[in-house]
């Protein structure tokens, strides 16, 4: 088991790592729309937040030695399911291999963001 860390994605905001490598898989922690350069949430729309989340995930996966194209499963959390279609538009541009996915509504997400996504990917 190996911890993954990159300064190109936000630091964890709790007692967890950005990702863990186990065997031939990497498990990311949920990423929210924190800009790693500023350490704050700057995006306000579901589209812009999803874009930042996907960029953060790409950085973590790259640090682990893999890529978003090797994602096998994602779990997505939306604060409002009315954002589902707009979320999917941006998500689909990044996850072109269409990994297995669960998407659920969460009453409230950290820092009051609109979206959070975690990934399991093959190394």
Predicted regions and their residues:
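Short, polar/acidic, helix-capping and beta-turn segments at strand->helix junctions
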Residues: 1-123
């Amino acid at each position: 088991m190996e911890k993954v860390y990159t300064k190109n994605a936000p630091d964890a905001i709790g007692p967890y790592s950005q990702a863990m490598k186990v065997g031939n898989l990497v498990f990311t922690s949920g990423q929210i729309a924190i800009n790693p350069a500023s350490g704050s949430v700057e995006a306000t729309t579901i589209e812009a937040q999803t874009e930042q989340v996907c960029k953060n995930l790409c950085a973590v996966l790259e640090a682990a030695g893999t890529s978003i194209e090797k994602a096998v499963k994602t779990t997505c959390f939306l604060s409002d399911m009315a954002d589902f279609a707009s979320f999917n538009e941006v998500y689909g541009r990044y996850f072109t291999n269409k990994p297995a996915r669960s998407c659920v509504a969460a009453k409230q997400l950290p820092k009051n963001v609109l979206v959070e996504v975690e990934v399991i990917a093959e190394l």
